[in-house]
From Swiss-Prot:
UniProt GO MF annotations: flavin adenine dinucleotide binding; FMN binding; tRNA binding; tRNA-dihydrouridine16 synthase activity
EC number: 1.3.1.-
Organism, as annotated: Salmonella typhi
Alphabetized Pfam families for the sequence: Dus
Claim: Metal-binding is one of the keywords in the record: no
Name the UniProt record assigns to this protein: tRNA-dihydrouridine(16) synthase
Gene3D superfamilies: Aldolase class I, Dihydrouridine synthase, C-terminal recognition domain
């Protein structure tokens, strides 16, 4: 089976990708989205989102990385897809699933689910602009407020020439509510298409991954939030390994505080460490205690001192 690390805006940046791929066995990472509006973006934008471009589009541990684009104008999606791959990205992905109100308000992400023809035009333009040996992939949800158009959406992706499709098993309106996950609908899409379909949504451990694959028939999954709850989740999902022990999680956090974010003004780790602990608290009691000890701190250096001082 393949396990992919999902794009998560404001969460899974290059530093977190570096950490997680070092202790996992991911087959691929997708970047946070590059927002495309009405221009060919400068090279520095791609390097900021995906510094791995400077290293053959791989993390330090060797996991391939693919740039994701977010936008609605086929011409500019195509030109930026061509630039991304010219810079070395291992293919390019089109975001048709982000449920953020800010993103949707500008016509991107899940908004495209209301217009399968636009998904087709965007993906087709990207496919034409990217060398044929490199993948062009698309990530979608089941629909905007219902799954009634899920086949129309999936057909648009395949007919555009996409290499594979990632399907998050909920509509935009359903957000991330667990009770609405529909792996069976993903399976119906998989049966309809000839390109590979990757299942995404509510995969937290070995059991849920097995259930997802059994229900959907997919042999590949993409994991997002769960990868932060259990830092070695790909190995849990692939090999039924136990979750990472807390002392190893601490070691990972300690390394994180030592990594430097380009352009950081001393605040980067404040938000990111607290955010990550918010995920870890769902699996580790110790994470709650650590969060309480740093919640009032507002400088990266202060948080680093607390975490580095933990005895393991």
């Amino acid at each position: 089976m393949r396990v992919l690390l999902a794009p998560m805006e404001g969460v899974l940046d290059a530093l977190v990708r570096e950490l997680l791929t070092e202790v996992n066995d991911y087959d691929l990472c997708i970047t946070e989205f590059v927002r495309v509006v009405d221009q060919l973006l400068p090279v520095k934008v791609f390097h900021r989102i995906c510094p791995e471009l400077l290293h053959a589009s791989r993390t330090p541990s060797g996991t391939p990385v693919r740039i994701q684009l977010l936008g609605q104008h086929p011409q500019w999606l195509a030109e930026n897809a061509a630039r991304a791959t010219a810079l070395g990205s291992y293919g390019v992905d089109l975001n048709c699933g982000c449920p953020s109100k800010v993103v949707n308000g500008s016509g991107g992400g899940a908004t495209l689910l209301t217009d399968p023809e636009l998904i087709y035009q965007g993906a087709k333009a990207m496919r034409a602009a990217v060398p044929s040996h490199l993948p062009v992939t698309v990530k979608v949800r089941l629909g905007w407020d219902s799954g009634d158009r899920k086949f129309e959406i999936a057909d648009a992706v395949q007919q555009a020439g996409a290499s594979e499709l990632v399907v998050h098993g909920r509509t935009k309106a359903q957000g991330y509510r667990a009770e609405h996950i529909d792996w069976q609908a993903i399976g119906e899409i998989r049966q309809r298409l000839t390109i590979p379909v990757i299942a995404n949504g509510e995969i937290w451990d070995w059991q849920s991954a097995q259930a997802c694959m059994a229900t959907s028939g997919c042999d590949a999954v993409m994991i997002g939030r769960g990868a932060l709850n259990i830092p070695n989740l790909s190995r849990v999902v692939k090999y039924n390994e136990p979750r990472m022990p807390w002392p190893e999680v601490v070691t990972l956090l300690q390394k994180y505080t030592r990594l430097e974010k380009q352009g950081d003004t001393g605040l980067y780790h404040v938000a990111r460490i607290k955010q990550w602990l918010g995920y870890l608290r769902k699996e580790y009691i110790e994470a709650t205690e650590l969060f309480q000890s740093i919640r009032a701190l507002n400088r990266s250096s202060e948080i680093a001192r607390v975490i580095q001082a933990i005895k393991i």
